[in-house]
Every structure is written in structure tokens, then in C-alpha cells.
Regions:
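Gram-positive cell-envelope targeting signals
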Residues: 1-26, 52
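A residue-level marker of the well-folded mature domains of exported/periplasmic proteins
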Residues: 23-292
Length: 292
């Protein structure tokens, strides 16, 4: 995550050097970079703001460019923040944005119309992606493929029940979903290899995968949803859980450690030697599988 945030700001600084001749005023002021992210207490996405603050301090200390962080708790607030930047009418500015969700597209289009260059980070909105100076994101399909490859290696068979805890409705979740299923059907490789022919899943097999819907990258939302899932004891038979982020995985682990699940159901579930994966490098996770 930290490496990706650094790359994001490097892209923004490169962008600043590209646009300075267009937007610089007579005094030759340095390009000012606005960095828009979720707040630091906003699940895994909060780490983006934390690392961005560190890099912004370095940028400001160097003196070639200036930068500031603006956090937004939700999409509506982020849209207002973008509109405020545009309304200020400043010269020689650039924007780095981690869109809260796809509804921010209209505000990003306003940046384009105002000829303010921007870098999109992490959540790429297809409708405006071509207008960005750069789209910086992780290998989200690769994350899904990695989980599918690991589970296949651990014995998951075509048609086994799988439960996927999704982050939100953005391109990040779509790609992590697709990476998982495309590996299973043989359309996508992982680590230079494709799934063995005798282990491939058919379209009918994929129907055994259940999707949670948007958990908003929230540990508490996932904990509540998981307790509800295991409120039906028959779901204790599900062995394979793909959480699309470590915060979601932690919600499941906290549910298993808490008192919201019937003890008999919990014992049945853990007796199945279930698997759980996440991603993001959260220190609390320790390892990708959940087995007892």
C-alpha cells in the first residue's frame, strides 16, 4: 500500500511538471497538488491517507511542489471538496483523487472541463478513466486469481460452496470478483500458471459462489453480516471464504471470537477446517488462512 501511494504522488509530481507551462503564473509559483482520499479511520482505505500524509510532508519539504491532503467521509463530501477546488479558480494546480465511489464521476468530469489535470488512484471510474493523466491501481484481478489458485491448491473442487465478501460496488470489487472466477475457468493465470484442466470450473459450477454485496470495506458491517449468515446453522458447512480485504476478514474473525454465533454452530463450522483469505497486509491478520 505504501509503495502504491508513493507511486501515486510521483505520478502527480510528474503531472505537475507537465502542466506548469500552461498553468504557472507570472511569479513562477510551484504546482500545488490536492490529494483527495478517505479519512484515516475509514477501514483499509484509511491507510492511504496515512501514507499520503507522510509523502506530502516530503514533497513540501523538498520545495519543488506543494501539496495538501483533503479527506472525505463519503462521496457527497468528496464531490463538494472537488467543486470547492474548482470554484477557487487557482492557477497551476493538479489533483490526485481516490474516488469514494462511482458517483464522483460527475465531479471528476468538472475537473476535466476546468482543464485541471488529475491522477486517479485505486478506484478507477471507467467513464472518465481516459481523461486522467494516469490511473494508478493495484493488481485487483491478480488478488482474486491468487485466492482461487490458493484454494484450488488446498483442495477446493469445482462446484464447492464459496462465499465472497465484497468491498463495495466499484471497479476494485468487480476486478477482484472477476480475477477469482476467471482463474477457476482457466481464462486467467496466476504466477505464470493456469488451473489444471481437470480442476476447471464450468459456468454451472460458478453458480455455487455466493456474493455478500457491498460491505463498504467495513469490519463491523462484515462482522454483523457473518453473524447473520451463521444464524442459519446449515451455512456452517461452507468451507471456502474469500474476503476481498483484510478489514473484511477481520470482521469474520471477530465474529468467530465473539458471542454473536451459537456455540454449536461455531463448533461445527470450525470442525470443517474452513479457509479464509484477505489482502492488504494488515498486521492483525498474521496469515491468510483461518483454520483450527
Amino acid at each position: 500500500m505504501k509503495k502504491t501511494v508513493v507511486c501515486m504522488l510521483i505520478a502527480a509530481m510528474t503531472m505537475g511538471s507537465m502542466v506548469t507551462p500552461v498553468f504557472a503564473d507570472g511569479d513562477g509559483d510551484a504546482t500545488h497538488i490536492y490529494v483527495l482520499t478517505a479519512p484515516e479511520d475509514h477501514g483499509w482505505t484509511g491507510s492511504v491517507a496515512t501514507f499520503a500524509k507522510e509523502k506530502i510532508e516530503e514533497v513540501n519539504g523538498d520545495g519543488t511542489y506543494s501539496a495538501e491532503l483533503i479527506t472525505s467521509a463519503n462521496a457527497a463530501e468528496q464531490i463538494v471538496n472537488i467543486e470547492d477546488i474548482i470554484a477557487a479558480g487557482e492557477d497551476n494546480i493538479a489533483v490526485v483523487i481516490q474516488p469514494i465511489d462511482d458517483t464522483v464521476q460527475s465531479a471528476i468530469q468538472q475537473l476535466v472541463d476546468a482543464e485541471i489535470p488529475y491522477v486517479a488512484f485505486d478506484r478507477i471510474i471507467d467513464g472518465v478513466a481516459d481523461s486522467a493523466v494516469s490511473n494508478v491501481k493495484g493488481d485487483n484481478e491478480g488478488i482474486g486469481a491468487a485466492c482461487a489458485a490458493y484454494y484450488t491448491e488446498q483442495g477446493m473442487k469445482p462446484g464447492d460452496a464459496v462465499y465472497v465478501y465484497e468491498g463495495d460496488t466499484s471497479s476494485v470489487t468487480t476486478l477482484r470478483d472477476e480475477g477469482f472466477t476467471k482463474y477457476l475457468t482457466g481464462e486467467l493465470e496466476y504466477d505464470g500458471k493456469t488451473i489444471a484442466d481437470d480442476a476447471k470450473w464450468s459456468e454451472d459450477d460458478l453458480k455455487s459462489i455466493t456474493y455478500s454485496g457491498a460491505m463498504n470495506w467495513s469490519r463491523s458491517d462484515t462482522k454483523t453480516a457473518y453473524e447473520s449468515l451463521l444464524g442459519d446453522a446449515s451455512n456452517a458447512d461452507i468451507k471456502w471464504f474469500y474476503a476481498e480485504d483484510d478489514e473484511l476478514a477481520m470482521g469474520i474473525l471477530e465474529a468467530l471470537q465473539g458471542g454473536g454465533i451459537d456455540d454449536a454452530t461455531k463448533e461445527k463450522f470450525l470442525g470443517n477446517a474452513p479457509y479464509l483469505t484477505g489482502c492488504g497486509g494488515l498486521d492483525e491478520i498474521g496469515r491468510a488462512s483461518c483454520r483450527e
